[in-house]
Regions:
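Active-site-proximal loop/turn and secondary-structure-junction residues that shape catalytic pockets
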Residues: 29-31, 49-51, 60, 78-80, ...
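Acidic (Asp/Glu)-rich catalytic clusters
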Residues: 34-40, 57-74, 90-105, 144-147, ...
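Active-site acidic/histidine proton-transfer and metal-coordination neighborhood
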Residues: 88-185
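N-terminal pre-domain/capping segments
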Residues: 9-97
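Conserved active-site loop/cleft motifs that coordinate metal ions or position small ligands
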Residues: 257-263
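Conserved, mostly hydrophobic/aromatic
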Residues: 45, 107, 188, 218, ...
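Gly/Pro-rich active-site loop or hairpin
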Residues: 54-56, 71, 124-134, 195-253
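Distinct, well-ordered alpha-helical segments
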Residues: 32-36, 163-179, 195-208
Length: 263
């Protein structure tokens, strides 16, 4: 079996799949019949795990049919990876089952919290960049990886608030989490740009901090302009400054599997 988490010996490597490459898109329900009917030349699709796990959710027959034709990845929003409630092992068991069922190459989740005392927020709340949060989330990611038996990808989120105390910049925090938990990174460049405009941080400096060998995927999306801030809305084309960041990132990291989000 696969050695996992804290059981890995120094110098040993996790098995890293390599069937996801090029530019993929998120698979949304209205498109599935057309995708199955016409088999468009798209390298890979991302599945939103929570859509498939929901009660009365999508037909697993569809899932099987798509998985026979395309490589897939699994993306989650429901784990509350940085939260203080106990990890939901039932949810994780469902993720593991779904991943095995569709043969997804990897599973990614957001570095955030989305519930507190079992109350669910309809938002992905950012973590404070502190030593305490760092230790906490590293421990939780290790537990998740031990449960799943593989590395996961963690994604940076957009932010619309600032904490009073920050002991790291966002890039250093992400890098320390990835190294400490021995996990991989999904870098959302639209979120970095949104945070640059909203909070004045330099997205390029965040990119500079991230270890290239940990970056497994990039997300691109469009933002929405609000009164005095940007919103990560996924309902606009990718903006020119985000394409510029993408070019900057690829010069540093080489070719990275990329997903364009549109909702």
């Amino acid at each position: 079996g696969t050695k996992t988490g804290q059981g890995m010996k120094r110098g040993e490597q996790w098995p890293v799949p390599s069937t996801i490459a090029g530019v993929g898109i998120g698979l949304r329900t209205p498109h599935i019949p057309e995708v199955l009917d016409t088999t468009p030349a798209i390298p890979w699709f991302e599945l939103l795990a929570d859509n498939w796990l929901a009660a009365g959710g999508l037909s697993l027959d569809y899932l099987h049919a798509v998985s026979e034709r395309y490589p897939l990845t699994l993306h989650g929003v429901g784990l509350s990876l940085g939260g203080t409630d106990p990890l939901d092992l039932g949810y994780l068991a469902n993720i593991k089952w779904l991943k095995e069922r569709c043969g997804a190459v990897w599973y990614s989740e957001h570095l955030c919290f989305s519930q507190f005392r079992r109350h669910h927020y309809h938002d992905l709340c950012p973590l404070p960049f502190t030593h305490e949060a760092l230790r906490h989330v590293i421990e939780r990611i290790r537990k998740v990886q031990d449960f799943l038996g593989e590395q996961i990808l963690i994604e940076n989120v957009s932010s619309y608030l600032r904490y009073r105390v920050s002991q790291f910049g966002e890039g250093e925090f992400l890098a320390r989490v990835a190294e400490g938990a021995d996990c991989l990174l999904l870098v959302d460049l639209n979120n970095l740009y949104v945070n640059q405009i909203n909070h004045g941080q330099d997205a390029r400096r965040v990119i500079d901090c991230l270890p290239a060998q940990r970056v497994r995927e990039i997300h691109l999306a469009g933002y929405q302009e609000k009164a005095g801030f940007l919103l990560d809305a996924h309902n606009h084309p990718v903006a020119e400054p985000v394409w510029w960041l993408y070019n900057y990132a690829l010069r540093r990291w080489g070719q990275v599997a990329t997903l364009i989000e549109w909702d």
